[in-house]
Amino acid sequence: MRNHSLKPSTAFGFVVLAAAGSVYAQGRGSARTDQTPIVEAVGCLSQTGSNWILTDATEAATATTTFTTPEALKAAAEKPLGTQQYRLLGTSPFSPDRHKGHKMAIKGLLIKGDSESRINVTSFQMLAETCAK
């Protein structure tokens, strides 16, 4: 006699697929408005302990693309610095130590908090080797 019971991992897979299908079906026909937009901010890259901070930054504005075009870099370089500050997350792949003190254009997911705002970085571009106001 054969045992027709499912392995726990197979059963879990079916549950995940069913849930995903349900979410997909609910989302069809209506645009999602709860998606976190990609934002861009321009500021000075500094380090506090092991944290990388974008200081003297512009207000984070919704970006039109997830990548940075040469035209967008030129426009960002012309922006004056601001008064905002963002702790940057996920900077390791971008080797931030090479850009300490530089004027930077940062794109990523904005995470607003009561005590600080953070950007989970998706694009990390140097605009100038100095960061003078």
Label every PLM stretch briefly:
Residues 1-12:
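Bacterial N-terminal signal peptides that target proteins for export
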Residues 21-133:
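Conserved RNA-binding domains used in RNP assembly and mRNA/RNA metabolism
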Residues 10-22:
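Hydrophobic alpha-helical targeting segments used for export or membrane insertion
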